[in-house]
Amino acid sequence: MELSEIRAELENMASRLADFRGSLDLESKEARIAELDEQMADPEFWNDQQKAQTVINEANGLKDYVNSYKKLNESHEELQMTHDLLKEEPDTDLQLELEKELKSLTKEFNEFELQLLLSEPYDKNNAILELHPGAGGTESQDWGSMLLRMYTRWGERRGFKVETLDYLPGDEAGIKSVTLLIKGHNAYGYLKAEKGVHRLVRISPFDSSGRRHTSFVSCEVMPEFNDEIDIDIRTEDIKVDTYRASGAGGQHVNTTDSAVRITHLPTNVVVTCQTERSQIKNRERAMKMLKAKLYQRRIEEQQAELDEIRGEQKEIGWGSQIRSYVFHPYSMVKDHRTNTEMGNVQAVMDGDIDTFIDAYLRSKLS
């Protein structure tokens, strides 16, 4: 490795450190740590043990990020000093040692970057993913089933557990809607990159004239919650209906009214669950889904208020396509947010979507 190449690597690291600092909002995190330390020094701190543990966990998490950043910064400065020394006094052994340390530090940078990419609230949670085909009948419904397979394969590749919470089959082929629970560490952190409208362009196998069709499927992604959030759902605000399960399942399908539909009357948000044999378990799961949807709604309303204050206008509905999957007249998958492209459409449909997820998360970091 030439000294000029080492210098280029160190300059790249300096640029990444600046991005890390901005993403971390270092000054505000240090101020928050000082706040929490002050709380922990209070003689009455342990009177409420649950609250105390929450404060300790937050402080430890913030300190981990800040200390990791400072350690990377110090290591980078040390390597920069070694590089400057080598410019003045070349030394083969010292340069080899510098190359070795540079490689090790690059690995630490990448690991820290991944921590930052998945450091938002609830990134670590399981994910609830919903697919809703747009207008277009069988063609759109078939596109929905293709995306269902894609996300299922992606989850399996990562060692995640994929469960079907609700499934409404299409009239001839595909799906009218599906809700998945994807269980695994950081499942929501990754899959939040998939929220939006997915567009398919292909020669439709359902069109005897062999014409090219464009289809759309909306993908909604929410974190699964246990008791992390305070969403108050009053009994009088919900309407619960039961019905017979209609999707693929066990022998219980269409034999008992085990499926549950819950409507939140103030917002008209509807959730359904039919994956369990027990109506009680389906209701428990449906309530978790409702909690997630109401949380998502709250966050989106807050974001809309911020956008209005900033004067930002965002496309909504079927115009807000995040990705196009073109099978004809050429093969290409393109993410419109990051301009990331892949020519191997079949690999993408087999679950190879990490390139798009990674590019999106990194774009949010910078």
From Swiss-Prot:
GO MF annotation terms: translation release factor activity, codon specific
SUPFAM superfamilies: Release factor
Residues the record lists as N5-methylglutamine modifications: Q251
Gene: prfB
Post-translational changes noted in the entry: Methylated by PrmC. Methylation increases the termination efficiency of RF2.
Alphabetic keyword roster: Cytoplasm, Methylation, Protein biosynthesis
Source organism per UniProt: Bacillus subtilis (strain 168)
NCBIfam families reported in the protein's UniProt record: prfB (TIGR00020)
Name this protein carries in UniProt: Peptide chain release factor 2
GO biological process: viral translational frameshifting
